[in-house]
């Protein structure tokens, strides 16, 4: 596309009518490279909404890339907003440097976003569940080969992170 920003919406998901407005305003207000929002889930099997709200006490939070990487494990423990491809708006110029790892068939979102966070200057989180993640039959997505591939790709990514080569230095 010819735009300045990119968002990803899965074909079977949907978003609130002000989804892009919320993400765009946060990105512009904070002069960030990436804006992240949270999500709610709709399970097709039981026709129910599942809403989580783990990050209480603030409407918006701003991170440098190093701050986000340092807190990623804690943040990801309760809320997958930072790892999923959905619910974000990104400056398109960052995507010229990073692509999805097509060898990974499960969990490729997290690797992709960690790489983007590493090359971003600032990330803003908006505590708003404007993305609706639709779940149908979860079991069909998790075969043994996909799990093996995912484990191997995560090990490869850990090795990449351990290299500690510029510009991705993790030394304090």
Describe the function of each predicted region:
Residues 9-11:
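Catalytic metal- and UDP-sugar-binding loop of GT-A-like glycosyltransferases, i.e.
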Residues 14-107, 111-123, 133-149:
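Donor-binding/catalytic cores of nucleotide-activated saccharide
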Residues 125, 129-172:
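C-terminal subregions of glycosyltransferases and related glycan-biosynthesis enzymes
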Residues 6:
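Short aromatic/hydrophobic "clamp" motif used to bind/position activated sugar donors
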């Amino acid at each position: 596309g010819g735009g300045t920003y990119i968002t990803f919406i899965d074909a079977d998901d949907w978003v609130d009518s002000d989804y892009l407005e919320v993400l765009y305003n946060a990105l512009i207000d904070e002069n960030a490279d990436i804006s992240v929002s949270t999500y709610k889930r709709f399970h097709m099997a039981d026709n129910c909404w599942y809403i989580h709200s783990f990050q209480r006490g603030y409407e918006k939070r701003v991170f440098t890339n190093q701050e986000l990487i340092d807190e990623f494990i804690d943040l990801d423990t309760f809320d997958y907003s930072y790892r999923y491809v959905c619910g974000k708006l990104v400056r398109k110029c960052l995507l010229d440097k990073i692509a999805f790892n097509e060898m990974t068939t499960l969990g490729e979102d997290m690797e992709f976003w960690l790489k983007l966070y590493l090359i971003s200057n600032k990330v803003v989180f908006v505590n708003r569940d404007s993305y609706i993640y639709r779940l149908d039959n979860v079991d069909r997505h998790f075969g043994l080969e996909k799990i093996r591939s995912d484990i191997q790709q995560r090990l490869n990514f850990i090795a990449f992170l351990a290299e500690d080569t510029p510009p991705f230095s993790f030394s304090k």
